[in-house]
C-alpha cells in the first residue's frame, strides 16, 4: 500500500520579515525606495486631523499600494484592498496596512494633482540616477 506524507494543519506562528519580501532588483523594491525619497507634502492639504480625528494612512503607504496595483493591471479600489490584505508583496510594501477600499478610492480621486507633481519628482530622480535618457519618453496607455 502506498504511503503519503502527513499534512499538519494545526495552528502555527510564522514570523515574516516584511523587508525580506521585497526582492532587490524587483519593481516593488525599487518602488518602495523611490516613494520614500519623494517629497509628499502636496498630499498634506487633504488631511485635517492635526488636532482631532483619527490618524490617517500615510500618503506614501497608499501611493505605494496604488502604484504597485496599477503596475499589475489592478485598478479597482476593492481589488487593491484585497491585495493589501492577501498578497504578501502588497503586505510587505505597505507595512501590513489594510486600507478600506473607500480610503483608496478617495485617495486616488482627490489626489490627482498631487500625484502629477510626484510623477515629475520621479522623473527627476530617475534622471539623476541615470536610469532614463532624455531623448524620448513614452508611456504605453494600452
For the regions a protein language model found, what residue spans apply to each?
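Detector for conserved single-position "signature" residues within domains
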Residues: 1-142
Amino acid at each position: 500500500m502506498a504511503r503519503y506524507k502527513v499534512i499538519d494543519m494545526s495552528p502555527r506562528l510564522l514570523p515574516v520579515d516584511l523587508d525580506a519580501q521585497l526582492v532587490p532588483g524587483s519593481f516593488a523594491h525599487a518602488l518602495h525606495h523611490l516613494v520614500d525619497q519623494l517629497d509628499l507634502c502636496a498630499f498634506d492639504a487633504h488631511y485635517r486631523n492635526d488636532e482631532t480625528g483619527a490618524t490617517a494612512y500615510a500618503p506614501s503607504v497608499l501611493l505605494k499600494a496604488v502604484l504597485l496595483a496599477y503596475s499589475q493591471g489592478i485598478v479597482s479600489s476593492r481589488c487593491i484592498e484585497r491585495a493589501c490584505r492577501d498578497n504578501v508583496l502588497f503586505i510587505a510594501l505597505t507595512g501590513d496596512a489594510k486600507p478600506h477600499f473607500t480610503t483608496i478610492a478617495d485617495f486616488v480621486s482627490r489626489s490627482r494633482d498631487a500625484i502629477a507633481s510626484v510623477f515629475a519628482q520621479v522623473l527627476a530622480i530617475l534622471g539623476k540616477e541615470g536610469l532614463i535618457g532624455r531623448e524620448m519618453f513614452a508611456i504605453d496607455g494600452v
